[in-house]
C-alpha cells in the first residue's frame, strides 16, 4: 500500500541467495504510484496483481488471506512493503527445514530500525528448535514477533484458515504463529530480517491500511 520503502523491500527479496521462489505483489488500490516501482523490476519471478477495490482499509486480515490464497509453493511468507530481508534469509530457513521437515513455522531472527535506517534493537538468540510451550514462553517474555518474519507451511496454514481475524488485525500475527507452532518452531541463529519502525507503519499511526506482498518458495 505504501511506496516509500517498497523498492528496497522488493530488492531485498529478489536478491536472495536462494533463487527458487515466486514473489506475488498485491496492490490494494494504493494512492501511491506502486505500478512504476513494480515495473522497474524486470524479473520473471514477480507476479503483480491489483485488487479491484481496497480491501485492507476495512478488513486487513481478509486482504492478507486473499494474498496467501495466490500462493502455490510448499511454504509462504506474507511480506510487508517496508521491511528488509537479508540475502541469506531463505537459505537459512531452507537449511533448518531440511533438518526438521515436520516443523511448520520458522521465524527469522529480527532486528528493528527506525525510518533513517539506524538500528533500534535486535532480538535475542533462541534455540534452533523450540517445542510449542517453549515458543510461548519466549514470546511472553519479549521475543520480537512481526508478521513478515514468519515462514509458514502453506498446506497446513491454508487448511487452518489462514490468519486469525481479530479486529484491526491487532495480535492476529502472533495468534496465527501460535496456531502454527503445535509441531514446534525453528529459529534462525543469524539475524536475517529487518523490521522498520515507521510513522507510516500500521503500528505507528493506528491505520489498518497496509499493502502486503508475498514470497512463495
Where are the language model's segments positioned?
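Short aromatic/hydrophobic "clamp" motif used to bind/position activated sugar donors
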Residues: 76
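Conserved donor NDP-sugar-binding/catalytic core segment of glycosyltransferases
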Residues: 88-121
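Conserved nucleotide-sugar donor-binding catalytic segment
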Residues: 130-212
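Glycine-rich, basic loop-to-helix element that forms the pyrophosphate-binding segment
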Residues: 52-71, 84
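Short, acidic, metal-binding catalytic loop of nucleotide-sugar glycosyltransferases
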Residues: 11-20
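The conserved acidic donor/metal-binding loop of glycosyltransferases
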Residues: 80-84, 109
Amino acid at each position: 500500500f505504501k511506496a516509500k520503502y517498497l523498492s528496497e523491500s522488493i530488492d531485498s527479496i529478489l536478491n536472495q541467495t536462494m533463487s527458487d521462489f515466486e514473489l506475488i505483489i498485491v496492490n490494494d488500490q494504493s494512492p501511491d504510484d506502486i505500478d512504476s516501482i513494480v515495473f522497474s523490476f524486470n524479473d520473471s519471478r514477480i507476479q503483480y496483481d491489483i485488487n479491484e477495490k481496497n480491501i485492507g482499509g476495512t478488513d486487513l486480515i481478509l486482504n492478507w488471506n486473499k494474498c496467501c490464497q495466490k500462493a502455490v509453493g510448499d511454504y509462504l511468507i506474507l511480506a510487508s512493503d517496508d521491511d528488509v530481508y537479508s540475502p541469506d534469509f531463505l537459505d537459512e530457513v531452507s537449511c533448518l527445514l531440511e533438518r526438521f521437515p515436520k516443523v511448520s513455522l520458522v521465524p527469522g531472527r529480527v532486528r528493528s530500525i527506525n525510518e533513517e535506517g539506524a538500528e533500534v534493537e535486535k532480538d535475542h538468540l533462541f534455540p534452533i528448535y523450540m517445542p510449542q510451550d517453549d515458543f510461548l514462553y519466549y514470546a511472553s517474555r519479549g521475543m520480537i514477533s512481526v508478521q513478515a518474519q514468519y515462514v509458514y507451511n502453506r498446506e497446513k496454514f491454508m487448511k487452518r484458515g489462514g490468519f486469525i481475524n481479530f479486529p484491526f488485525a491487532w495480535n492476529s500475527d502472533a495468534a496465527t504463529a501460535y496456531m502454527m507452532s503445535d509441531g514446534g518452531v525453528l529459529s534462525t541463529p543469524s539475524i536475517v530480517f529487518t523490521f522498520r519502525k515507521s510513522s507510516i507503519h500500521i503500528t505507528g499511526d493506528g491505520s489498518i491500511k497496509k499493502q502486503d506482498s508475498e514470497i512463495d518458495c
